[in-house]
Amino acid sequence: MCGIFGSTNIKTFRELYTKNSERGNFVRSITMLFPGGMKNDIRVSTKYEQDFDKTIEENPFCIYYLGHVQSPTSGVRDFHIETSHPFNLKNKYIAHNGVLSNHEELIQEYNLDIKSKVDSDVILPLIEKIGFNDAISTLQGTFGCWYYDANHAELRIFRSGSTLFSNGGDFSSIQVSDEYKDITEGSVLIYNFTNNTFNKEICVSQ
């Protein structure tokens, strides 16, 4: 079991982390998104940590904080970055909560180049191969994901089977309050960095 969560506000993000940490205490990742045009032009930065008591530091330039807490996978019990979330490929990033049931079939069917034995590692190569909508509709099993395309500065969240809630601007695998509403299965919410809300929805058939 794992958990995903995100917020623009560091205080809220820390609270979401505390709530979600019960879903995974093996390794955590903190991913920060930055605007374009900065001197070093770094758009995404991720820290992987196993010290769950360490304070999550604020970065004044971060425009969105994304998190993932992970339990050991069924096949991997040691910490390795290549088997930890988020996975990344060609400036695209994804963190996944759940278990895919058809990842081995997808690897064979689409001749995907997978670097690890973790089921989540199939998602980005599949998106690269057949496109986002077709890839998501092809997945079977359970998943709640955040996905960021740094090439287009586009943040998306979606789920099928796994829990995922949002209050409009923040999201979490755990419903931390009544303000957080269940995200409809088969819907993909797209974040608007201007008004700081997930206010665009597309439907993907399952």
Residue ranges: model-predicted function:
Residues 1-206:
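N-terminal segments that mediate ammonia production and transfer
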